[in-house]
From Swiss-Prot:
UniProt organism field: Pseudomonas fluorescens (strain SBW25)
NCBIfam families: EF-Tu (TIGR00485), PRK00049.1 (NF000766), PRK12735.1 (NF009372), PRK12736.1 (NF009373), small_GTP (TIGR00231)
HAMAP family, per the entry: EF_Tu_B
Gene giving rise to this polypeptide: tuf
Organism taxonomic ancestry: Bacteria, Pseudomonadati, Pseudomonadota, Gammaproteobacteria, Pseudomonadales
Protein name: Elongation factor Tu
GO MF term set: GTP binding; GTPase activity; guanosine tetraphosphate binding; translation elongation factor activity
Chain segments carrying region G4: 136-139
EC category name: hydrolase
Pfam families assigned: GTP_EFTU, GTP_EFTU_D2, GTP_EFTU_D3
Length: 397
């Protein structure tokens, strides 16, 4: 059979498995590729290959992640699976693999465990919008009442962290059976097929980056005699067209301006799009009115803030992080997009110190405003050295 070429016409959705160690995340990941290859014609990936996930670096942090892909009838899925709990924490906080939805794998034999809870909390903090549940190892549970009990526990846990527990789809099955091609009582391949159909129906198509409101972090500012001020950067999302009204947000008071030209590789364009490095010519803006670290945005789409709740991963000594813990009142630099801003860290009640390698919820107060939204990633630095990674969980002011 000829090798199929990647079908760009199918909408692309990013998912991943989350849940407690040994509840069957990797087995389910392998089973998904197997079932989808038989039903929808994508490639099979073996358990061992997923389990020995390669190391990758995201923002200087080493993370082991396995990436697989599979198709349903209507979509192309990119799926991430992490071997260790620490890898999940790092992955979700750095946004190395952002998920449009997560598959929570919970063993029906054991019920929710500490990491089940922690992964749901992390999903909430980093803004994973949808969770679908797969109750695994159901072939080991003879008692229907026990299954119901575990299902109720999982729903309660989801509701605790503001996911719609009562309405979350829960599929009951056995990933091992599906991987072995068995299907007694529809627990094997049928359950995985049902899972894929649920992903199709429950997780909506993600909004494409290009359809979101325009945002470009400013990396550099030039003044071109006779033409005015040009700001350069890589467009993070959306489209900017000549004559669009724009706002410059962060570090100082927000100012209003107009795009009078877009340049890329010294050519003039009518518009700049997400992912492109370009220069935007601004009308009526002086060279000294703008600086690196501000963002150029569609008016009203992003506001400047200084205080927020964050979920943070502190690099271990081995990862080049701090060798010693830090305490309340810690004042490092927070690196947002293109600039560092000093901020003060408030630790949760009862937490005296934070050790390298920990992940922690903290409240940060910056000394200058930054254009920010929930889900924005940042690095924590000391004198230019990265010592942590974080994500804005909730804006306070």
């Amino acid at each position: 059979m000829a090798k199929e070429k990647f079908d760009r016409s199918l909408p692309h959705v990013n998912v991943g498995t989350i849940g407690h160690v040994d509840h069957g995340k990797t087995t389910l990941t392998a089973a998904l590729t197997r079932v989808c290859s038989e039903v929808f014609g994508s490639a099979i990936v073996d358990f061992d290959k997923i389990d020995s996930a390669p190391e990758e670096k995201a923002r200087g942090i080493t993370i082991n992640t396995a990436h697989v892909e599979y198709n349903s009838l209507i979509r192309h899925y990119a799926h991430v699976d992490c071997p260790g709990h620490a890898d999940y924490v790092k992955n979700m906080i750095t946004g190395a693999a952002q998920m449009d939805g997560a598959i929570l794998v919970c063993s029906a034999a054991d019920g929710p465990m500490p990491q089940t809870r922690e992964h749901i909390l992390l999903s909430r903090q980093v803004g994973v919008p949808y969770i679908v549940v797969y109750l695994n190892k159901a072939d080991l549970v003879d008692d229907a009442e026990l299954l119901e009990l575990v299902e109720m526990e999982v729903r309660d846990l989801l509701s605790t962290y503001d996911f719609p527990g009562d309405d979350t789809p829960i599929i009951i099955g056995s990933a091992r059976m599906a991987l072995e091609g068995k299907d007694d009582n529809e627990m094997g391949t049928t359950s995985v097929r049902k899972l894929v159909e649920t992903l199709d129906s429950y997780i909506p198509d993600p909004v494409r980056v290009i359809d979101k409101p325009f945002l470009m972090p400013i990396e550099d500012v030039f003044s071109i005699s006779g033409r005015g001020t040009v700001v350069t950067g890589r467009i993070e999302r959306g489209i900017v067209k000549v004559q669009d009204p724009l706002e410059i947000v962060g570090l100082r008071d927000t100012t209003v301006t107009t795009c009078t030209g877009v340049e890329m590789f010294r050519k003039l364009l009518d518009e700049g799009r997400a992912g492109e490095n370009c220069g935007v010519l601004l009308r009526g803006t002086k060279r000294d009115d703008v600086e690196r670290g501000q963002v150029l945005v569609k008016p009203g789409s992003v506001k400047p803030h200084t205080k927020f709740e964050a979920e943070v991963y502190v690099l271990s000594k081995e990862e080049g992080g701090r060798h010693t813990p830090f305490f309340k009142g810690y004042r490092p630099q927070f690196y947002f997009r293109t600039t560092d801003v000093t901020g003060n860290c408030e630790l949760p009640e009862g937490v005296e110190m934070v050790m390298p390698g920990d992940n922690i919820k903290m409240v940060v107060t910056l000394i200058k405003t930054i254009a920010m939204e929930d889900g924005l990633r940042f690095a924590i630095r000391e004198g230019g050295r990265t010592v942590g990674a974080g994500v804005v969980a909730k804006i306070i002011e």
